Amino acid sequence: MASILELRSRIKSVNSTKKITKAQELIATSRITKAQSRVAAAKPYAEEITKVLSELASASASLDHPLLNERTDPKRAAVLVVTSDRGMCGGYNSNVLKEAEELFQLLRSEGKDPVIYVLGSKGLGYYTFRDRDLGGAWTGFSQDPGYSDAAKASRHLVDLFMAGSGSEVPAPNGEGTIEGVDELHIVYTRFVSMLTQSPEVRRMAPLEVMVSEEHVELGEDMLSNGHGSSNSEPVAGYNFEPEPDKLLGALLPKYISTRIYSSLLDAAASESAARRTAMKAATDNANELVNTLSRQANQARQAQITQEISEIVGGANALASSAGSD
């Protein structure tokens, strides 16, 4: 058994660590509420731009836009992987990176070359350590993303997609050029609840379009949790100026930015929830470890006292025996 001094030193060390994990837990808890509020605040805009684009697509003379049309022979697919800038969030990053690897395998099996783009320092470090080629990376805002952060990534990715494979566009860092792509995908973590966060894969371009007899809708819409726009409500009539085709071309890139921004907000809430869960588990484990070490220290102290008493009694008996023999 370890000595009492060693056990007390370990108890002190664990208590110091527990203070850190408890503080991180409280900070993450406060950030979850803010992140959820931002998700809720962004939802009305996301829903309205989806409705307007659906109306534009319905009023358009044709749906002949690169962001809506499937490429005949897609060769390259850009994948935007959303990770965190900081650690101590349990399996948050490993889960989304695992989901991304599965997507890469699927794309390769379809004959497409995946081009990796990363949001977050953890993802950047993961791929850099493994010597994986990256098309670009954006870091420093995973916990508090702004629309401008999403727009920076969106501008480059839309340019990349509009160029298509075989054409070159400037690299996001301004150094050299990079070949265009035929598909855009995003891998992020969707916030379900405080205890559940689900890694998700979504294709951003070309957008899926569902055409009915009277209406056109954008399919697989993640801006309204996958439910799309509701047909149960009366639809207002629109008079578009300029022509619907021109408006559609102007709004579709903004729609891609909105999808990325919505994913970043979801990921920020998921990151805080995962960090809170991980830090709470660490704090609980620290409490259990302190209790165990305290019990061992008490047992060691009790054994030491018992040994000291035994030595005193033994010495007294020896003295008594020596005095009796004299």
UniProtKB/Swiss-Prot annotation:
Q: What is its main location?
A: membrane
Where is it located?
A: Cell membrane
| Record GO biological process | proton motive force-driven plasma membrane ATP synthesis
Gene Ontology terms, cellular component aspect?
plasma membrane; proton-transporting ATP synthase complex
Q: What does the subunit section of this Swiss-Prot or TrEMBL entry state? A: F-type ATPases have 2 components, CF(1) - the catalytic core - and CF(0) - the membrane proton channel. CF(1) has five subunits: alpha(3), beta(3), gamma(1), delta(1), epsilon(1). CF(0) has three main subunits: a, b and c.
Task: Please provide, alphabetically and separated by semicolons, the GO molecular function terms listed in this UniProt record.
Answer: ATP binding; proton-transporting ATP synthase activity, rotational mechanism
Per the UniProt record, the source organism is Rhodococcus opacus (strain B4)
**HAMAP family xref list:** ATP_synth_gamma_bact
The UniProt entry lists membrane topology as: Peripheral membrane protein
Q: What is this protein called?
A: ATP synthase gamma chain
- Pfam families documented for this protein: ATP-synt
Function text:
Produces ATP from ADP in the presence of a proton gradient across the membrane. The gamma chain is believed to be important in regulating ATPase activity and the flow of protons through the CF(0) complex.
Q: Say which family it is in.
A: Belongs to the ATPase gamma chain family.
- Record keywords, A-Z: ATP synthesis, Cell membrane, CF(1), Hydrogen ion transport, Ion transport, Membrane, Transport
Keyword Ion transport in annotation: yes
Q: Which residues cross the membrane?
A: none
